[in-house]
Every structure is written in structure tokens, then in C-alpha cells.
């Protein structure tokens, strides 16, 4: 998501606050629990939508990406690493996160202000060539989360199968000689 933020700032330099730098904004995304107080502390999905409100006067690029990052952080319980015996995130939540990124990608492509201009410039035609790098980047994130959700779902199914086999094995009582 840091890469997406850099690309959005390069395409929408007016969104970067004067007192900040791209590097500072990217570093702010790396904190496991994002500070969203500059936006009034909204829920992550509200923050993504806020970037496309006509009356919003803040940093639309950061609001959009920080909302996505906050959603992803929430799915992973605001953790950056997992150890072998740790509980992993629920497959359904990871799957839902991928769908949320799809929705955000759609909003990025389609939302326009009252004068017909996009709130955030992203994909578009430049010099007669389609630049779909934003959609590709978001598609990559969606694909990674889909693959992870499938792997987690299979892990859960294996665990359920192991529990069922374990329970079935206790049907027979041990006999001594």
C-alpha cells in the first residue's frame, strides 16, 4: 500500500500537505495501529469513502490508502508477524478484505466531483496509451489476499478433519491384558 500511496502522490501532487513529505506519509502507514485523528478518527471503510466526498478538504490520497491499510491491519489484528503457534487471521476476514480492496479500486476508477474530474487521478490514457498500473497494483493485493484466504480456509478444514479423526479414535476404549 505504500507503493500505491507514492504513485497516487506522484499523480496527484496537490494532495500532499505542504508540511509533509511522501516518505513521511509512507512511514506513517507502517505503524501497526494507524493514527487517523487528522481525519476525526473514522472507521477504515468510512475513511476510504471520505476521500471521495465533495466537501472533504484533506489529503485524499492518504485518506484512501490509510483507510485500506487500517482495514488490512485490522484483519491481521494489527500485527506485522506471526509465530508458529500463533492463531492466524480468519479466512473469511481475509477474503472480505480482498473484496473491500476491489470496492476501493472501483471507487478510485469511477468517483468524480461535480465538475466531472476524478477526485484522485489514477488509471488513464496518457499519450494514447492506457496506464492501468493502479488497477494492476490493486489487483495484485487482491490476488495475494485471495490466495491467503484460500490457504487459511484449507488449514481450517485440515484442522477440522484432524479433530474429527481424533474424536472418532476415542470411540474405542483402551483394553489392557
What are the residue ranges of the model-derived segments?
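N-terminal Sec/ER secretory leader and immediately downstream segment
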Residues: 1-65
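Mature extracytoplasmic/lumenal regions of exported proteins
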Residues: 44-177
